[in-house]
Amino acid sequence: MTPFLLGYFLGSLPVAYWFGALRGKDLLKEGSGNPGALNAFRLLGPVPGLLVLLLDLFKGVLAVAVGEGVSGSPLGGLLGGVGAVWGHAFSPWLLFRGGKALAPGAGVLLAVDPRLLLWALALFALLTALFRRPYRAVFGVALAMPLLAARLGKTAAHLLFGLGVGLPVAFRHLKDWNR
């Protein structure tokens, strides 16, 4: 439980929101209303947007490392990564509003196994070409994440990891289905 909670805390840190506040912008009320890297890029410019993206990616990587370090087991890393994605999507700092969790999710996948991130990106490209709607493609990748992770790790823990990472991402993208 400790790796998940530590990951949740790291993921919950609303980096984009804080960058916006430093510039006098409320990312929850401006642009898309999403406290994430893309809205930061659009409202604050490319440099702050890129910094937010990198810091959000780092939150995911760090959560996996901390989870594994605290537990002494790769399973702790999986739990820490899941916690980071849920923390970003449902941040207590923002009254449980949060980002779409793509950047920390990508960091988690990168830290767990870079092949998992590559598979997710390849599936995203394929689904984007098919649907011509990136939000639907992200939703599809999020729903496929349990199968991708289980194929990689071949364990029930990896299946549950994929479910834990995919569910909040799918949930946060559901409202954008028609975009």
Where do the protein language model's features map onto the residues?
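Alpha-helical transmembrane segments within multi-pass membrane transporters and channels
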Residues: 9-27, 51, 130-136
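Short, non-helical or kinked segments that cap or interrupt transmembrane helices
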Residues: 26-36, 93-106, 133-140, 144
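C-terminal ends of transmembrane helices
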Residues: 16-21, 87-97, 124-131, 170-179
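Helix-loop-helix junctions within the multi-pass membrane cores of secondary transporters/permeases
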Residues: 36, 40-44, 49-50, 54-63, ...
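Cytosolic, membrane-interface loops and tails of multi-pass inner-membrane proteins
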Residues: 18-49, 98, 178-179
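Interfacial segments of multi-pass membrane proteins
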Residues: 41-44, 67-70, 87, 102-131, ...
